UniProtKB/Swiss-Prot annotation:
NAD(+) binds at K194, G246, S247, V248, P249, T250, E405. InterPro entries: Ald_DH/histidinol_DH, Ald_DH_C, Ald_DH_CS_CYS, Ald_DH_CS_GLU, Ald_DH_N, Aldehyde_DH_dom. Converts gamma-trimethylaminobutyraldehyde into gamma-butyrobetaine with high efficiency (in vitro). Can catalyze the irreversible oxidation of a broad range of aldehydes to the corresponding acids in an NAD-dependent reaction, but with low efficiency. The keyword NAD applies. One of its GO terms (molecular function) is 4-trimethylammoniobutyraldehyde dehydrogenase activity. Belongs to the aldehyde dehydrogenase family. Homotetramer. Pathway: Amine and polyamine biosynthesis; carnitine biosynthesis. The keyword Oxidoreductase applies. It comes from Danio rerio (Zebrafish). One of its GO terms (cellular component) is cytosol. It catalyses: 4-(trimethylamino)butanal + NAD(+) + H2O = 4-(trimethylamino)butanoate + NADH + 2 H(+); an aldehyde + NAD(+) + H2O = a carboxylate + NADH + 2 H(+). This is 4-trimethylaminobutyraldehyde dehydrogenase A. The gene is aldh9a1a.
Length: 508
């Protein structure tokens, strides 16, 4: 009897906060969900908004990882032989299905991740747009012709890598799975994807959608697990590439493991990004930009501009307005349309964020608003992982809250006087994922962008990420890129073919 996709099961038809319980197996390879072999290492997965158990995450062992990778390799042998146009048609169908089921996927994402439904729906839109974008690129993949003397010539072929591994993060579970799989599949690869153990659900929905759209069974597989499962994936001899999104310490381990068999690696790691607001800015836009740079997804965004440098002359007005609007942010049930901030991913993470705020106060910082555990009025949310959005003043560059990634709804505001000074301070970090500048001076805007040591610089906006635009970091924020046409280079390899049209000239 054929399996019902997760999205067609009754429990996913009318998701509301505190109601969803997932009992289906969440591994997927060979075109179907696969029951785990061993449940002894099962870990509970919690619904962030309520603190109740949503499902169990049962990690894959060595035999299961091997099965998933071999299934992917078999599918790769078929998929890579299709034309780009044939691959494109199937990917466009997957994008259409996601678009059609946007709301149901978004609700499942909210239950597992805790972000507001408003944001989750945008995430799902970005996912189908990404797949649609790379579906458009698939038929255009081509090489180059090089004319050589005597009528000889050479040409290049852009070829797939084989089986790629994607390791996702818990802040954008479905979107990251799409970001990694879409360019991989467009190039003719297969992918085995490991979601975060805290958000195991929606990547399986993507796998089922790809199957429904017509990809060969095994082309996009999902294995559940934590560090041990990730290690098995990185060490497997049939894996050609690993794309990882997550923390710097784990990224270093991924790179080390991949190096043993010289696998290609893309790393999208942490950040402590600067947002520089000059006194000549359009202040209203700068305030909105600062809020967008700090409070999306409860502050759990790697590229957030959490070090907000404000030119001293406008600091009082900026703080007054930012605090007023931060206090007005609606925190609560993430499935309610009016909610603008949901729950943090887990209780330990919530406690870590609150610990950063406590330490900031001990180091001289001043909490202008928020920074406390928030308990909504709704009784079912009393055990949720909510934190009121926080603005910190009196911050210094040497404070922990300014140097380390908090990954929560905490904005650290710092004054500055000159462009030269703020650039030096902004670049004084081991991270280099993103940056931003607000100014009306077009020359200054481009000068500052050129001098900021980061993979992305936003001018007069922040946290805008169209799928057409490459995204990735400098320094310890990683390397490689996601999105944009350049990502094709990270999921393919170039073969040079040299053709002699005359006789061989030999020295021997």
């Amino acid at each position: 009897m054929a399996q019902q996709p997760l999205l067609s099961l009754p429990e996913f038809q009318s998701v509301s906060t505190g109601t969803l319980v997932v009992k289906e197996p969440l591994n997927f390879w060979g075109g179907a969900r696969v029951k785990p072999r061993d449940t002894k290492n099962s870990e509970p997965v919690y619904e962030p908004a309520t603190g109740r158990v949503l499902c169990d995450m049962i990690p894959c062992g060595e035999e299961e990882v091997d099965q998933a990778i071999k299934s992917a390799h078999s599918a790769y042998l078929k998929w890579s032989q299709l034309s780009g146009m044939e691959r494109s048609r199937i990917m466009l169908e997957a994008a259409r299905i996601i678009r059609e089921r946007r709301n149901a996927i978004a609700k499942a994402e909210v239950a597992n991740n805790g972000k507001s439904i408003t944001e989750a729906e945008v995430d799902i839109d970005v996912a189908w747009q990404c797949i649609e974008y790379y579906a458009g690129i698939a038929p255009t993949l081509s090489g180059q012709h090089i004319q050589l003397p005597g009528g000889s010539f050479a040409y290049t072929r852009r070829e797939p890598l084989g089986v790629c591994v994607g390791i996702g993060a818990w802040n954008y579970p479905f979107q990251i799975a799409a970001w990694k799989s879409a360019p991989a599949l467009a190039c003719g690869n297969a992918m085995v994807f490991k979601p975060s153990p805290m958000t195991p659900v929606t990547a399986v929905m993507l796998a089922e959608i790809y199957k429904e759209a017509g990809v060969p069974d095994g082309l996009f597989n999902v294995v559940q697990g934590g560090a041990e499962t990730g290690s098995l994936l990185c060490h497997h001899p049939m894996v050609a590439k690993v794309s990882f999104t997550g923390s710097v310490p784990t990224g270093k381990k991924v790179m080390e493991m991949a190096a043993k068999s010289v696998k290609q690696v893309t790393l999208e790691l942490g950040g402590k990004s600067p947002l520089i607001i000059f006194k000549d800015c359009e202040l209203e836009n700068a305030i909105k930009g600062a809020l967008m740079a700090n409070f999306l997804t409860q502050g759990e965004v790697c590229c957030n501009g959490t070090r907000v440098f404000v030119q001293r002359e406008i600091m009082p007005k900026f703080l007054e307005e930012v605090v007023k609007r931060t206090k007005a942010i609606s925190v609560g049930d993430p499935l309610c349309e009016g909610t603008r901030m949901g729950a943090l991913i887990s209780k330990p993470h919530m406690e870590k964020v609150l610990g950063f705020i406590k330490q900031a106060k001990e180091q001289g910082g001043k909490v202008l608003c928020g920074g406390e555990r928030f308990v909504p009025n709704d009784p079912k949310l009393k055990d949720g992982y909510f934190v009121s959005p926080c603005v910190l003043d009196n911050c210094r560059d040497d404070m922990t809250c300014v140097k380390e990634e908090i990954f929560g709804p905490v904005m650290s505001v710092l004054p500055f006087d000159t462009e030269e000074e703020v650039l030096q301070r902004a670049n004084n970090t081991t991270f280099g994922l993103a940056s931003g500048v607000f100014t009306r001076d077009i020359a200054r805007a481009h000068r500052v962008a050129a001098n900021l040591q980061a993979g992305t610089c936003y001018i007069n906006n922040y946290n805008v990420g169209p799928v057409e635009v490459p995204f990735g970091g400098y320094k310890m924020s990683g390397f490689g890129r996601e999105n944009g046409t350049v990502t094709i280079e990270y999921y393919s390899q170039l073969k040079t073919v040299v053709v002699e049209m005359g006789d061989v000239e030999s020295l021997f």
